[in-house]
Amino acid sequence: MSRTILFQGDSITDCGRARIEITDPAYLRSGLGLGYPYLIAARLLCDRGEDFNFYNFGISGNRVVDLYARWKADCINLRPDILSILIGVNDTWHEKARQNGVEVPRYEQFYRMLLDWTLKELPEIKLVLLEPFVFPFSAVGGDWIEESDQRREVVAGIAKDYGAVFVPLQSILNNALKVAPQEHWLADGVHPMPAGHQLIADAWIKAAAPLLN
C-alpha cells in the first residue's frame, strides 16, 4: 500500500507549483513545483517505484500562523503518513518589511499547536522538521541573523520533544560554502537556487531514510 508524503511550508516549498487538484492526472508532473519536493519525489519514485504518493501544499508568503489557519483542509483532511514542514523565514521577513511577522515565542507556540493538533488526529504520522535558513546578503539584513538563529533553536527543540526527524539545513548550507559561494546556493539569501534545492532534497532523503522503509 502506498504511503503519502505531504510537504508544507512557504515559497521555498511552493516553488511555482500548479494549483491543481491532487486527483488531476497532471498533479505529479505539475503540482509538486520545481523545488526540493519535486526532487525528493523524483528520487524516491525512481528508487522505490510506486511506494509513495506526494503532495505539496506549500504556499508562498506563509507564516506559521497561516499554516495553522489552513491546517484542517491542507493537512488533517489529507491524512498523510509522513509530514514535512519548513516554515519560519516569513515570520521574520514580514516583520522586517511591514511589521506583520510572528515573534519567536508565538512562532514556537503555533508550531507546537500545529503538531499537537496533527498528532491528536493522526497519531501514527511521522514528522520531518526542517530548520529555516538564511544567508546574510540581498534580501536578508544583518538584523535577521539573531532572530533566525532563535527560530532554528526552536525547531530543533520541537523536533526533539516530538520525536521528529530534524534536518539542520543552516549547517548543511554553511558547509556548502566550502564548495561554492552563497549566491550559488541561495538567490537572495532566502530562496534556493537549483543547487540549493538539490542540497535540501539530498539532506531530507538522508535524514528521513528510517521513515521510508
Feature map (PLM): residue ranges:
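Serine-esterase "nucleophile elbow" of acetyl-processing enzymes
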Residues: 1-57, 72-79
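Functional beta-strand-loop-alpha-helix junction segments that form "active/interaction loops"
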Residues: 59-64
